[in-house]
Design a protein with these regions (language model features):
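Single conserved hydrophobic/aromatic residue that forms the stacking wall/gate
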Residues: 112-123
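ATP-binding N-terminal substructure of ATP-dependent carboxylate-amine bond-forming enzymes
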Residues: 1-112
């Protein structure tokens, strides 16, 4: 079981993940942008860390900042929620290579989905 999960998302999805973690007795870390510092997910999490500015590319999609947040908070798993990094092969692979659990599909499954979905959709 995980001891601490970093939630790499915001809003309602992050709130739901945090509430589920609390039910299981798992500590949570919320990442946030500079403008989301008063958001509900930040208030509900056990810890929070600002990972960048209001632009998603500078915060919720900023893999180096998120990796730093994982290290600083000593998180042993990451839950991406949906959107943002949930289907990012490189992110999932980096986590796997660093023995950090990714709460989601394996990097291979993410890669396979991105290769086959366009083909299936064009049929």
């Amino acid at each position: 079981m995980f001891k601490k999960i970093l939630i790499a998302n915001r809003g309602e999805v992050a709130v739901r993940i945090i509430r589920a973690c609390k039910e299981w007795g798992i500590s949570t870390v919320a990442i946030h942008s500079d403008v989301d510092k008063e958001s509900m997910h930040v208030k509900l999490a056990d810890e929070s860390l600002c990972v960048g500015s209001h632009q998603p590319s500078d915060s919720y999609l900023n893999i180096p900042s998120i990796l730093s947040a994982i290290e600083v908070t000593n998180s042993d798993a990451v839950h991406p929620g949906y959107g943002f990094l949930s289907e990012n092969y490189n992110f999932a692979k980096i986590l796997k290579d660093n023995n950090i659990k990714f709460v989601g599909p394996s990097p291979d499954a993410v890669s396979y989905t991105h290769l086959t979905l366009p083909t299936i959709c064009s049929v």
